[in-house]
Amino acid sequence: MTTPPVCSYEGSDYQTSFWEKGGRAYEDACEAYALRRLLPTQGEHLLELGAGAGRNTPRYHGYKRITLLDYSRTQLEQARERLGDSPRYRYIAADIYHLPFVEGVFDGATMIRTLHHMADAPLALAQVERSLQPGAAFILEYANKRNIKSILRYFLRKQSWSPFNCEPVEYIPLNFDFHPAAIRKWMGDLGFSIIRTLTVSHFRMGLLKRLFPVRFLAWLDSLAALTGKWWQLSPSVFLLTHSKLDGISAPEGAIFACPACGNPLEDTPPLLRCSRCQHAYPVQGGIYDFRLDPPAGVN
């Protein structure tokens, strides 16, 4: 099956090295502010795309159930260790380009620090849209190529690519920045309505993070975030969107579909087998594995 390349964090200590020991307390606090502003107060079933080790999951307290999805099984193992085996959580190892769900399952979704790994962002977003109920809330974060730093670097001739054209820029392999206009077009083409835009991490500079307390800097950022409805010049942008109202809602109790052929699957752990194409998907250690091409050496 032809698919865009997938960025895998399998075996990575990303949660520890980047978030816990990497000096990212400011960025984490900024994201917490944004989520508090954008999240619905309540919901039934949230899909967290690119959930990683579950850093943001406790912030989704308004939802009764949360499905954590990540390509990396080891990241999900860390999330399960952090969050436990509550019936509220379901852990799914899968590829966003081939989501293992029937149409219209979720009434909410988030994709934070994940789209920037998508070589085919419109295809990934189309898969998300397909999984959402009509009018579902979808919070999308993306890395903004038209930020102040990249604009200054471009005018000073310290970078070759323009922050003003709408094409994504791959600054290192499988790491992309996107233009706000491109994101708006893709979302509009899929029927999403953009309800609110917040700009985030305006003060992502080592000097400022050393000079000012995290809480103060994040509070300033939360004020600057309100300018997002007029302009987007920060390195990170959050959108609250709603899916189209004329979509499909899944039948009661239906959730899984074969990512290889789309046939509905019965939830029958420890193994889910597709009656149409005979693909089999194991459930081990509390994690459903729907990856069509898992990393070598990973069961």
Predicted segments, located by residue:
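Conserved class I S-adenosyl-L-methionine
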Residues: M1-Q42, R55, Q75, I139-S162, R291-N299
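A short glycine-rich, Lys/Arg-flanked "PGG" loop and its adjoining helix->strand segment in the class I
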Residues: P122-A137
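Class I SAM-dependent methyltransferase SAM/SAH-binding core
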Residues: L47, A51-H98
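A short SAM/SAH-binding and catalytic strip from SAM-dependent methyltransferases
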Residues: G108-D120
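A C-terminal cap/extension of S-adenosyl-L-methionine-dependent methyltransferases
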Residues: R157-S160, K185, R196-T268
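A short acidic, Gly/Pro-enriched loop at the edge of an enzyme's catalytic core
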Residues: Y97-A109
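Acceptor-substrate binding/catalytic loop of class I
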Residues: W161-A182
